[in-house]
């Protein structure tokens, strides 16, 4: 067999779609060379046309959203498919799909990238289901999902992941999430990254992006397809239902709302459409595009209320006296929800850090792209939480590529300001963090500058698992040994608890001696 160099393999894979046995001849490659091309990208797809796998999302007590996308040539600019393909779906109460409870057919249209979003209703609360799709004479892998319970719930366990730069590591964290005994997964944003190739896959990168920076709908579709080329990500989607929000890299770094003129608005619309096409996201039919509605509130029986926030679509520029990170409509919605919130645990899925973060005593805010760039609105919202009497608030956050635990106060500069909740910021799945030297030097400085900061650890990668009962909310920081290893083992670094009816968190005594660059003495 004639061996191709890496550049030729990447070019062929990008032009035709890696690891799909329908494309090697059109790209001038044999099947063996096609597999080599896929390996050069670090991609490994399911059999066509269901190369990108299956997923479920937004579980409710009688309904769940099922997703797939037909992509026989996942990295091609266009799919060689009919304009509309009929896709059959089935839902059953057993993995063999024999005890069928629902079935139907949905159109996969080229207009939406041949994606399928099926809201299945009439299901039983708190029940596990299995599902699959069939199209073009082929059947997808079988996915597993579950509905939310109704009424009394004794416990819930869920995972949270964020920031998964493809070139920075393999998705061992998602491999572990797929194997976790959790009810659902929350993704907190930066699902993809928009920049082009890092070039040559240097020592600190295990694989590379395909092509240049994403600008068009075709670009964003290919980037999503590349990320789903990691088998572990597809396994995590197939294993559990997901709730999702986004941050900035799904479009472009640090963007705000529609700021940037007509070219940016067009780019954002393309990015949002590709995101919707590739996610198990439930939206209200014709209103889904060009602006999918991300923010929502969902109940897990009488135990937990999950509020998913959108901190990108409606924000103004940062550092304005009247600036907004939520937008007027979403802020009013959030306040109304706070006012009528049930007596339960309240979890906000929040893509960027809510708590104040100064780099050193007397220093400025480290990053004003997060809530620190919207001081008046943050104080307004958290003061409303306090005034409403809302208790048992936990905010789960991504973006920082490091783990933080913070007390939440309406006024972070006033140590007498009441604690109204706890924020857990999770490690990234793969996205690069600061160096160990930086963390060692700056961890104590951040601790001294932020009296509300209880914990900081920035040398590891992974995800969080949250375990909730009527009496306690526990956050387990799950970390991988090596992001360069696709099957890296996972361990629990430390655990923090929040007791019901009490403000603030505390570290579990059994893990209090675990490595960290800052922890406040308790």
Where are these regions (language model features)?
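Metal-dependent phosphoester/phosphodiester hydrolase catalytic core
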Residues: 2-522
């Amino acid at each position: 067999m004639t061996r191709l160099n890496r550049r030729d393999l990447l070019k062929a894979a990008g032009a035709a779609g890696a690891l799909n046995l329908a494309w090697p001849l059109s790209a001038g490659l044999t099947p063996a060379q096609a597999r080599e091309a896929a390996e050069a990208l670090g991609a490994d797809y399911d059999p066509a046309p269901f190369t990108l796998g299956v997923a479920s999302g937004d579980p409710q007590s009688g309904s769940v959203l099922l997703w797939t996308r037909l992509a026989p040539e996942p990295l091609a600019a266009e799919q060689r498919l009919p304009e509309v393909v009929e896709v059959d779906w089935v839902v059953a109460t057993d993995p063999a799909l024999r005890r069928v409870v629902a079935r139907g057919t949905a159109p996969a249209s080229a207009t939406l990238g041949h994606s399928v979003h099926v809201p299945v209703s009439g299901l039983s609360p708190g029940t596990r289901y299995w599902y699959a799709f069939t199209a073009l004479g082929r059947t997808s892998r079988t996915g597993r999902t579950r509905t939310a319970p109704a009424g009394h719930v004794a416990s819930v366990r869920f995972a949270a992941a964020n920031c998964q730069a493809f070139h920075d590591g393999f998705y061992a964290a998602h491999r572990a999430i797929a194997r976790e005994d959790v009810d659902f997964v929350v993704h907190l944003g930066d699902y993809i990254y928009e920049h082009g190739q890092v070039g040559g896959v240097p020592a600190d990168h295990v694989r590379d992006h395909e092509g240049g920076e994403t600008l068009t709908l075709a670009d964003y579709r290919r980037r999503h397809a590349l990320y789903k080329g990691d088998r572990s990500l597809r396994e995590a989607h197939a294993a559990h239902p997901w709730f999702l929000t986004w941050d900035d890299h799904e479009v472009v770094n640090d963007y705000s709302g529609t700021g940037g003129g007509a070219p940016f608005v067009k780019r954002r619309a393309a990015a949002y459409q590709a995101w919707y096409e590739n996610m198990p996201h439930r939206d209200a039919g014709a209103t889904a595009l060009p602006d999918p509605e991300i923010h929502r509130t969902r109940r897990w029986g009488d135990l937990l209320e999950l509020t998913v926030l959108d901190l990108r679509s409606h924000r103004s520029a940062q550092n304005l006296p009247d600036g907004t990170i939520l937008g007027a409509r979403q802020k009013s919605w959030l306040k109304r929800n706070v006012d009528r919130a049930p007596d339960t645990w309240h979890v906000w899925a929040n893509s960027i850090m809510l708590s104040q973060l100064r780099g050193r005593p007397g220093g400025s805010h480290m990053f004003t792209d997060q809530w620190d760039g919207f001081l008046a609105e943050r104080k307004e919202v958290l003061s409303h939480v306090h005034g409403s009497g809302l208790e048992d608030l936990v905010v789960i956050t991504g973006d920082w590529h490091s783990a933080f635990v913070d007390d939440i106060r309406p006024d972070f500069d006033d140590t007498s300001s009441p604690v109204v909740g706890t924020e857990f910021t999770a490690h990234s799945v793969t996205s690069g963090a600061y160096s160990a030297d930086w963390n060692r030097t700056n961890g104590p400085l951040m601790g001294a500058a932020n009296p509300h900061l209880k914990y900081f650890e920035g040398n590891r990668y992974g995800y969080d698992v949250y375990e909730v009962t009527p009496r306690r909310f526990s956050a387990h920081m799950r970390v991988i040994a090596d992001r360069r290893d696709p099957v890296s083992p996972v361990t629990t670094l430390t655990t923090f608890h929040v007791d019901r009816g009490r403000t603030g968190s505390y570290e579990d005594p059994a893990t209090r001696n675990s490595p960290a660059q800052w922890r406040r003495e308790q």
